[in-house]
């Protein structure tokens, strides 16, 4: 009788989670995700190799998030960060093909994230953007064909340690 009962539990399994609508949020931060609000400031950072970048982060729910332990895994999504100034794309590089990390502890509106990616800018000096409005954007495409985008209109501020 015990074997029959245990077999019934295994056959039933856990209920499937309810599907959620795919969503994305663009943010910043180098260790933890930091949300951005339209009209807010974002730091332009002078990197160790002489260039300038904005720290780019995102969090998502409802998409294939890939394998965060294997950057070469074909199931990983592709994310593209970009910055426009005066209608011109000033992004030198900002594309990543990698798995997203689960958000721990679980709960809230988001399931996975990536934090602190570099959106490298094609600018000669941070003075070019000091106090200027920029359009910061992200697009993520998963292997199931789901594409999500988010944008923020921000004010560029040179990092105080530049």
Predicted feature residues:
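C-terminal motif of bacterial Sec signal peptides marking the signal peptidase cleavage site
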Residues: 10-11
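Contiguous beta-strand segments within globular domains
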Residues: 41-78
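Short, solvent-exposed, Trp/other aromatic-anchored flexible loops in extracytoplasmic proteins
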Residues: 94-134
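Short beta-strand elements
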Residues: 146-162
């Amino acid at each position: 009788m015990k074997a029959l009962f245990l077999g019934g539990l295994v056959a039933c399994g856990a209920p499937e989670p309810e599907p959620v609508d795919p969503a994305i949020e663009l943010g910043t931060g180098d260790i933890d995700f930091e949300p951005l609000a339209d009209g807010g400031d974002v730091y332009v950072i002078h990197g160790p190799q002489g260039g300038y970048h904005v720290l780019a982060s995102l969090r998502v729910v409802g998409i294939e998030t890939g394998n965060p332990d294997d950057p070469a895994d074909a199931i990983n999504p592709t994310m593209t960060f970009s910055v426009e100034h005066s209608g011109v794309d000033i992004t030198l590089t900002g594309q990543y093909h990698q798995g997203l990390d689960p958000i721990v502890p679980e709960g809230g509106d988001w399931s996975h994230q990536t934090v602190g990616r570099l959106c490298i800018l094609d600018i000669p000096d941070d003075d070019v953007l000091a106090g200027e409005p920029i359009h910061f954007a992200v697009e993520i495409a998963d292997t199931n064909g789901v594409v999500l985008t988010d944008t923020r209109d921000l004010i560029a501020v040179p990092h105080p340690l530049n």
